[in-house]
Amino acid sequence: MCKNVLRQLMTVLFIVVALPLAKAQVHVGDILYEDNSEGESGGKAIGVVFYVDGTKQHGWAVALNDEGELSWGPNWVNTPVPDRLSLQGALADMDGYANTKKILSLSNPISIFYPAFEAMDFSNDWYLPAVGQLKKLYSNLDKVNASLSAVGGTVISTEEGNEFWSSTEYSVSSSWFMDWNGQMHSKDVTYNGTKDGRRIVRAVRSF
């Protein structure tokens, strides 16, 4: 009897020990570290979480600093990135990774013709965000900027005149960008979204 009880206790203990510890939930404003962990690992900070999906384990993080003011690419050149001719269609674009990959796959000298994309550290999974991703970023800007400040990053400025490129293309002549108020624009009467215009570039990555 004692042996059976001991065997059962050992089995229960083994099961408890063998169960993996649940990963802590990720929140907007958490720090992304170099080892791809989030929260407060104490490692090297590389980004700030600005969106978390339904699993509470995965989402998107924005880089700590801008890459400068760069042009998107040449005007009147068709790219493999799908055209988004309406604001609704542009906001539905959540795949900056795919957009960036398509541009970087072109045979042209990328650094000359597509500076905003060349600035991305794509080999380490950083990419130019799509319009839908920029909108998510702007909606959580207070939390994101607080965390950026805490780790010595550059806050995302809402100073009038600041404009941020997305990887979402409007047409052969222009691409979408976000202004300092979080509004999205392409080429129109008021805002000139021609691809050769210089705008702020900030990378994001998925985790």
Regions found by a protein language model. Give the residues of each.
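Short, compositionally biased
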Residues: 16-122, 188, 195-207
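Bacterial N-terminal signal peptides that target proteins for export
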Residues: 1-10
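Residue-level recognition of phosphate/Mg2+-coordinating polar/acidic sites
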Residues: 13
